[in-house]
Amino acid sequence: MSVLTPLLLRSLTGSARRLMVPRAQVHSKPAREQLGVLDITIGLTSCFVCCLLPAGWVLSHLESYKKRE
């Protein structure tokens, strides 16, 4: 590393420190109804079926996609 690198980095981060970043005022309420085990199971299963199953099928058949016949 060069001798000037710390000076350059300090000058770049110095201007960023002066910027005002607005903070979000986020407040949450408790859930209206608690989710049961069945609801969570159905949600995770549907995510698996919709997202991971097609991706797994494509990855398992990748060799057949590479062949040009």
Curated annotation (Swiss-Prot):
Pathway: Energy metabolism; oxidative phosphorylation. Its main location: mitochondrion. The chain crosses the membrane at residues 37-60. One of its GO terms (biological process) is mitochondrial electron transport, cytochrome c to oxygen. Component of the cytochrome c oxidase (complex IV, CIV), a multisubunit enzyme composed of 14 subunits. The complex is composed of a catalytic core of 3 subunits MT-CO1, MT-CO2 and MT-CO3, encoded in the mitochondrial DNA, and 11 supernumerary subunits COX4I, COX5A, COX5B, COX6A, COX6B, COX6C, COX7A, COX7B, COX7C, COX8 and NDUFA4, which are encoded in the nuclear genome. Belongs to the cytochrome c oxidase VIII family. It comes from the Eukaryota. GO terms for cellular component: mitochondrial inner membrane; mitochondrion; respiratory chain complex IV. Residues 26-36 are mitochondrial matrix. SUPFAM superfamilies: Mitochondrial cytochrome c oxidase subunit VIIIb (aka IX) (SSF81431). In response to mitochondrial stress, the precursor protein is ubiquitinated by the SIFI complex in the cytoplasm before mitochondrial import, leading to its degradation. Within the SIFI complex, UBR4 initiates ubiquitin chain that are further elongated or branched by KCMF1. It is found in: Mitochondrion inner membrane. PANTHER family: CYTOCHROME C OXIDASE POLYPEPTIDE VIII, CYTOCHROME C OXIDASE SUBUNIT 8A, MITOCHONDRIAL. Component of the cytochrome c oxidase, the last enzyme in the mitochondrial electron transport chain which drives oxidative phosphorylation. The respiratory chain contains 3 multisubunit complexes succinate dehydrogenase (complex II, CII), ubiquinol-cytochrome c oxidoreductase (cytochrome b-c1 complex, complex III, CIII) and cytochrome c oxidase (complex IV, CIV), that cooperate to transfer electrons derived from NADH and succinate to molecular oxygen, creating an electrochemical gradient over the inner membrane that drives transmembrane transport and the ATP synthase. Residues 1-25 form a transit peptide. Keywords: Membrane, Mitochondrion, Mitochondrion inner membrane, Transit peptide, Transmembrane, Transmembrane helix, Ubl conjugation. This is Cytochrome c oxidase subunit 8A, mitochondrial. A motif (SIFI-degron) lies at residues 2-19. It holds the Pfam family COX8. Residues 61-69 are mitochondrial intermembrane. It is a single-pass membrane protein.
